[in-house]
């Protein structure tokens, strides 16, 4: 399971008519669990976003690029790193530039280059490209010249630093096509209170949504590795016969719904 903690430090100023200069400070901390789903943008349309929901890295490639857009009115520092599937250690890739300033309304590109690693030649291998957008603190030297906006003039600023981790899939030459085209090969079986998804393909099957008899299937990680089985607990009240609807995500972020009946 991949867990990415997003930490939001917010400082909110509140004024009363009789106490104009008094601030009420509220500290907000929220954690968001990410379990192998396809990419989410760093922010919404007013912030920083990535140019793709995943990166497919050909086995012998000399490097791939990914665009980074800043739709906000202020600059961000962009910091990038590639981690292994567990997200506990660095993967054998370098990102250039690893750290740069991205002004508001501008676009830049990062290049991901493999530097080693013993990856299998018969299946995909999963890594994570993690990109962090760091907003300027008040009076930060690197942010000089930032565009004036509502946030820039606020007496108490809200600092927001977000991590976005998207899949970086190393794809060998022997693995061709798109996972959505072979998703029908995934089989589902029910035994007792568990349901098992079996993936006989060389692709990571990325699942954006799954239900059993219309009830949400809770998946610890929302993907099924190549040549692997994933076991989940059945939703409450589901018996041996069930209809499974699941949505697979393809190379370009496209989604395709599949329906399977298990007797």
Describe each model-derived feature in a short phrase.
Residues 44-67, 177-187, 221:
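Beta-sheet-dominated interaction scaffolds and their linkers
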Residues 68-72, 195-201:
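Asparagine-centered strand-capping/turn motif at beta-strand->loop junctions
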Residues 59-65, 122-126, 191:
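Short, solvent-exposed loop/turn segments enriched in Ser/Thr/Gly
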Residues 46-49, 67, 71-113:
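Surface-exposed binding patches on compact interaction domains or structured appendages
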């Amino acid at each position: 399971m991949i867990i990415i903690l997003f930490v939001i430090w917010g400082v909110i100023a509140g004024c009363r008519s009789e106490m104009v200069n008094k601030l009420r400070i509220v500290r907000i901390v929220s954690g968001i669990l990410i379990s192998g789903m396809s990419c989410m943008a760093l922010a919404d349309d007013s912030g920083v976003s990535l140019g793709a929901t995943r990166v497919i890295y050909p086995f012998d490639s000399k490097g791939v690029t990914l665009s980074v857009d800043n739709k906000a009115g202020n600059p961000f520092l962009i910091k990038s790193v590639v981690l292994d599937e567990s997200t506990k250690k660095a993967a054998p890739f370098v990102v250039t530039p690893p750290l740069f300033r991205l002004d508001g309304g501008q676009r830049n590109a990062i290049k991901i280059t493999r530097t080693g690693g013993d990856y299998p030649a018969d299946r995909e291998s999963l890594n994570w490209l993690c990109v962090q957008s760091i907003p300027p603190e008040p009076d930060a030297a690197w942010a000089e010249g930032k565009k004036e906006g509502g946030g820039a003039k606020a007496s108490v600023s809200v600092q927001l630093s977000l991590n976005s981790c998207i899949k970086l899939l190393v794809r060998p030459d022997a693995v061709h096509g798109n996972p959505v085209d072979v998703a029908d090969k995934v089989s589902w079986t029910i035994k007792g209170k568990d349901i098992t998804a079996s993936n006989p393909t060389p692709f990571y099957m990325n699942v954006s949504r799954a239900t059993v008899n219309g009830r949400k299937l809770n998946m610890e990680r929302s993907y099924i590795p190549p040549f692997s089985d994933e076991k989940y607990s059945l939703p409450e009240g589901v018996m041996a016969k069930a209809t499974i609807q699941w949505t697979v995500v393809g190379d370009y972020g496209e989604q395709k719904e599949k329906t399977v009946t298990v007797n």
